């Protein structure tokens, strides 16, 4: 993956919040065909993460935390400092990103953030079960949108890779609108994996879908991986 240049961001549009990218211990899954984020690891993540956490001001009362895997894979020292900072800055709402496999551990993990509203997002990427299998997401094909929504308030959708169709994208957006409080759309950029961009699909998305949804308050769209200020 490309070197990370920035790990802290202030997002002021649609969903105002502080947004941080921490280093985890490395995603346990590491099998999604299009992803190389799990390479964002080092021997002492706390050394990096402590500096990122010090930037938190509590300005919006909302903090969004992502890392090179799932929130449960943040090292204990970093997690303790994060909780301390959340309390110190009177942050009331925390968003965390986790893999589907951790769904039954969300309630217990939320208890670490006492008296806070903790909401979770997962990288479902698509609601087309066959496509999820091609992408090796590690989410069973019989998992329905309604079941995902039992655990998660938000999802990430991926647009613009091989084997994906225009109809897939339309369907995914409509399903996400129906079931989730908010969601993110990430336009795929080629990275160190063998997966290639579907440039025709990306162009159709930009010309035929993006103009109609870009101002929707439920939807954040990253046309580039650093559009939210981290990466």
Language-model segments: which ranges?
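Auxiliary Fe-S-binding modules of radical SAM enzymes
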Residues: 2-16, 59-60, 170-231
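Core AdoMet radical
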Residues: 37-52, 59-76, 86-104, 117-142, ...
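Alpha-helix N-cap and loop-to-helix initiation/capping positions
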Residues: 43-47, 74, 135-140, 164-171, ...
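Distinct, well-ordered alpha-helical segments
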Residues: 74-83, 103-113, 167-169
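Alpha-helix-loop-beta-strand connector modules within alpha/beta enzyme cores
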Residues: 79-89, 140-156, 201-223
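Short, conserved loop/helix-junction motifs that constitute active-site signature segments
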Residues: 87-90, 111-115, 149-150, 177-179
